[in-house]
A protein has these predicted regions:
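N-terminal low-complexity, Pro/Thr/Ser-rich intrinsically disordered segments
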Residues: 30-72
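Hydrophobic membrane-insertion alpha-helices, especially the h-region
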Residues: 9-21
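Second-shell loop/turn segments in exported
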Residues: 64-73, 138, 146-149
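A charge-rich, low-complexity, intrinsically flexible signal that marks solvent-exposed coils, linkers
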Residues: 79-82
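Functional cores of ribonucleases/endoribonucleases
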Residues: 84-168
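Solvent-exposed, acidic/flexible segments
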Residues: 53-56, 60, 73-76, 120, ...
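N-terminal Sec-pathway targeting helices
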Residues: 1-11
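Sec-dependent signal peptide cleavage junction
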Residues: 19-34
Length: 168
């Protein structure tokens, strides 16, 4: 989706929601749902506008939105190979000491157990989220080369879809 079309699309969706909110014959529940959806859209729009392409991000929501918006990881991510070349030892949890505060991300995820959707030509990648130094935690984002973005809070036990298609 063109970057200029996105604000117009958001405005259109908001207008429809507001129209539903004001002109709903059902009242009560429909109005509450419209209000909640409108608030969520406004929050997402504000988050999207506040992300800088040259920024560093570590939280699940920011990293997922960054991948969705820019089709790449933030600058504060390095692959395992790059980390090893800097002297990283996973057992000692010294990543921040050798990398200047970077997080692990960008390596291929094999999806051997086929727990994520498969498609011809689809490749999966992973990155750590909510990393605060020391040993790596269990939280990861898995993202595909065709725009799927998933979150796992428990090292690949459960997966939650965050985004389905990239912004263009």
């Amino acid at each position: 989706m063109n970057k200029r079309l996105f604000p117009a699309l958001v405005a259109f969706v908001i207008a429809i929601i507001i129209g539903t909110f004001f002109f709903s014959k059902e009242g009560g529940e429909a109005n509450k749902n419209a209000q909640i959806l409108l608030e969520q859209l406004n929050k997402e729009r504000q988050k999207s506008q506040s992300l800088a392409e040259n920024g560093s991000y570590t939280s699940k929501d920011e990293v997922a939105l960054y991948i969705y918006k820019f089709n790449k990881l933030p600058k504060n991510f390095i692959t395992k190979k790059e980390a090893l070349e800097l002297g990283w030892d996973a057992k000692s949890g010294n990543l921040w000491q050798v990398s200047g505060g970077k997080s692990i991300g960008g390596d291929r995820f094999s999806n051997r157990e086929k727990r994520l959707p498969e498609a011809d030509g689809r490749k999966w990648f992973e990155c750590d989220v909510n990393y605060n130094g020391g040993r790596r935690g269990a939280e990861r984002i898995l993202y595909s080369n065709d725009g799927l973005i998933y979150y796992t809070p428990d090292h690949y036990e459960h997966f939650y879809l965050l985004y389905e298609k990239r912004m263009q």
